[in-house]
């Protein structure tokens, strides 16, 4: 780094944000008109943009074109064969010139994790099962605040709330091993983490006492459950950790939350903060290999670094909670990217939950954790701007949700390129960044596919690109969109390899060790 370049302190960084002269201008006033429906302005498009915009990227393929394929993705590999698992399907991506469906409907569940278990010599697939939430409907735009009976769907839900485990060693014949309930009156699970080792980390509220959730679209506050999966056929709960104040009987702690005041009638219902774990807690080094740390995105409570030295007694080591204007509305901290830990940083993003910029813009944060007892925000990613030839001057005027959703999953083939990261950015498409200098992230490429859905149909057309995954060794990017899965390359990542290639290294220490 240039010696003349000053490194921002936490105090200076937050002061700049508060005054609007720093990396992103901030306003603390909440909109007077707000709900989860569309909020067009005179400048807004009256249609969905079906055009494609590309900068510094190439499209290699579109898998399942025209289909809504925005779900989470995971990789597995057997020899030179590589497979992409998504939305219950297994897709053969070995030869990127002709990716093809391999096993359609081979498993149940879209919140998925897959990893190789060396002791069992099997690929183990874990999928989540979640009870209904209290999201807005056409008749109840403010969710549970408009219609308390929306919670009846959660209360009366009779199916599994928890996770399912499968033997995926033969991707053509995936076999269910067990179902694990996190609690019959709880939330089930949303975003989970499994690395093939002894433990899985589940994003859950295990029962109906976790009720202090201000958000209009969730009935409960989730925490982190650690489960022993040494035998995936018989998982066992190890421990549960949550934010004090989340449960009935913890009202004194709840009232200490600044977020407990951000509820109707003090704020408009769809500007309420999302409290608790969005998930998952990422554990980059397996506990049985000496790992002791987990990194979680806890909504309005921000980043929490977990001490997992004793998995039976989870502890909070430290955290960074964003300024209040970022916590009220949407999911302030949605995902933590741990691909820069060797350099002493993590990246965190929020999730915009309302369309047409009917919320404060939620930035992507760079957080210095070299002193893990005191995480310090040092930068925000630049806010995307539309292409010059787009029919709108701001993404707020393009219909749908504008904001980051997910970075690539931590588990992937190859060594993570520490100076490059793509983000799924809803209606702004896929955005790619140079993070060689963590204090000055720079956008270097983008891909914006056509918008899917129908503007006249509630709940469609507002996401565009929801997820992203990277094969670091073959240097290809997968963008999960509502018009298919796009396979992309970017010169900043390197020249893509399209031919079948055995995986010789995975992105984390001992990940999928022993897989052949």
Where are these regions (language model features)?
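N-terminal secretory signal peptides
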Residues: 1-12, 16-28, 33-35
